[in-house]
Amino acid sequence: MESTLRRTWAEIDLDALAYNYHALRRRVGADVKFLGVVKADGYGHGAVQVSRALQTLGADYLAVSSLDEAMELRAGGITMPILILGHTPREQVKNLIDLHITQAVSCQAKALEYSQEAVRCGGELTVHIKVDTGMSRLGYLVSGGHFAAGTADICTACGLPGLRAEGIFTHFAVSDEPD
């Protein structure tokens, strides 16, 4: 049942989405992977509908915050790769593997936890390594004198049994601030 208590809403023009996708694709080139972030219901814009459009357009990946968001996309017919940017409890690793969902790993403790659980389940979990480049966000710290230790930890995580490291990323949450 639709709520009539709110007086504001957003209407997403999927033709405009397609135009913007093609503009970005031209800008970065066909050899660069395209990941559409649709977390928090596409920031309130309808994650399933936007994801279907991006899948049809040829995007390579989607990103969400949590396993429940990823499961909603799978239930909505999304078959393309999905990356979970947030934490997933270790007891859900089998679901990640079974649903072909990629998990972000932001520290050695999580890498070890996911590795142990994937091995216990008899599967392989695809992961992307999250790097903190000095903005005090989650991730392996590789700035401010931590480069050698951080990269060593990343290399160790990439070699853990039960994990298949596919990508690496960072998050410029406040990139316009000087520090």
Where are these regions (language model features)?
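Active-site-proximal beta-alpha core segment in soluble small-molecule metabolic enzymes
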Residues: 2-4, 8-11, 16-19, 30-179
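Conserved PLP-enzyme active-site core in the AAT-like
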Residues: 27
